[in-house]
Amino acid sequence: MASNVFQEVIRDRILYIIGFYTLILAVAMRILPEIAASTEGKIFLDFGIALMGVIGLIVSVFVGTGLINKEIEKRTVLVLIAKPISRSEFITGKYFGLSAVLAVLVTTMTVIYLGFLQIAHIPYGIASILIAVLFLFLQISLINAVAISFGSFTSSLLAVILTFAVYLMGNISQDLLKFGRLSQNPGIEHLTQALYLILPDLSRLDLKNQAVYGLQALPSPTALAMNAGYGLLYSSMLLAIAILIFSRREF
């Protein structure tokens, strides 16, 4: 199942996405010296990783939300679940297949990004960038799990909207918690605490701003390990929920 998803998605415009990333980086490298003469290196470092994240997010959301609904709409899900394959294998196969695509996509974009840094003679810390990219992959893999979870029980359009909402709220979940404390309103504070517990704290997996300053700017190895474990655990919980919901659906 995972290999089928991988082959299907890889041949479905992934090369165009990589080409688009390369083109945007080339344009940015050309125009940044004209608009930010003294800080173009730092901006390009930030921009390259941020663009990777945006592209990975788009692929995760739009492909992930449609993986299950496409099978349902085409009625091929009936054939698949009739085979000696459990519904849990169906969900996890979809997840790991798309995660493999995202891994290939992120790896390829990273190689291209590092190539541009070399061409432009922009100093960078290879270790910090690779760690940031690894955590970026964990983040978009988590969003992949969110997308598949919503796609297991809603329409593709609603799943896209809900997944983007989770992404946006997940990036400001710590700010929501601080806002609740500052409000000094028990009702608002309880609401923001509940949202923080439910929503993924995606800021734990976002290291792009620190990575450009080198390893010394990154969290400690213990904090990195805990944050990586958090991302993996949250993704596993989402998959468990998706499997539970999908196993109760009738076709």
Q: Regions from the language model: what does each represent?
A:
Residues M1-Y16:
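Aromatic- and glycine-rich beta-strand/loop motifs that create alpha-glucan
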Residues A2, G66-S99, F246:
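Helix-loop-helix units of permease transmembrane domains in multi-pass membrane transporters
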Residues E8, N69, L80-A82, A147, ...:
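Helix-capping/transition residues at the boundaries of transmembrane alpha-helices
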Residues Y16, V77, S88, L157-V160:
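Residues that define the loop-to-transmembrane-helix transition and helix capping
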Residues L23-L67, I91-V160, Q193, P221-T222:
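Secretory targeting signals
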Residues I35-S38, L158, T163-L244:
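Terminal transmembrane helical anchor/hairpin motif
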Residues L57-G64, V77, I112, V146, ...:
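Hydrophobic/aromatic residues in alpha-helical transmembrane segments
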Residues S247-F251:
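Short cytosolic juxtamembrane segments of multi-pass membrane proteins
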